[in-house]
């Protein structure tokens, strides 16, 4: 049976494989398709698609948006985006500008804590990448300030560390709307990782469904069988498609491999077939997927 992976990161955000290397690794692993879902950027998609040309692998254009809901970081994956559309690229510029401001302030704080770093040096060390905290951690490790990536997060850039600066984020509802307007399939990523009560998670999913959520990540690298069953029940309750992904980052997540996660992950191609069927319905009848109070009028603001 063919397998797929619908949640994968490259060097264009915080992964350690280039988009081209991901294609080769996916072929080695026997995948029929994978989605490149870098954080807040589509910069690696063209390279991945070009690398896959003429090879037995499909590269699905995707993204993973960071958003905030009731004080928690919530991620929304988008698949089959019209990522080159003017609308979508304008939205990404806003995300990039927000990250630049955050990163400049983090560099200033690191300098105050004895780290010789400038934003320009950081960007030059990771050309073409959306700078995330993983890049800071790698910089600190390679320049001898820490002995491990974990130490970098604990001492400098983790959530409770002195040099961390939170970014202003959109709501997950807004992320769903942006993905829909870009012609994509919005999916709630790894809901178990948010450590919400069942009632609170149900409330979040209901709110997202109201604005057009299509899928939910019910198959994921770290889920226990009981957790997968919980999310599958939630998907059934709200008539959502099942999605699945490893959240592969390469060396940034040691022991977690593409498609197989920590060894137990299995995402059958049927998952992608169902999502493709839903996507075809969306394109054929777009009005049916804009009936639930989706407010596109102010999305350029």
Q: What is each stretch, according to the model?
A:
Residues 89-98, 123-126, 162-163:
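Flexible, glycine/proline-enriched loop segments at strand-loop-helix junctions
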Residues 68, 105, 109, 116-117, ...:
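Phosphodiester-processing cores and adjacent nucleic acid-binding clamps
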Residues 1-31, 43-84, 92-95, 147, ...:
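Charged catalytic cores and adjacent phosphate/nucleic-acid-binding surfaces used
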Residues 126-191:
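Conserved acidic, metal-coordinating active-site core of Asp-based
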Residues 97-124:
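Conserved phosphoryl-transfer catalytic core
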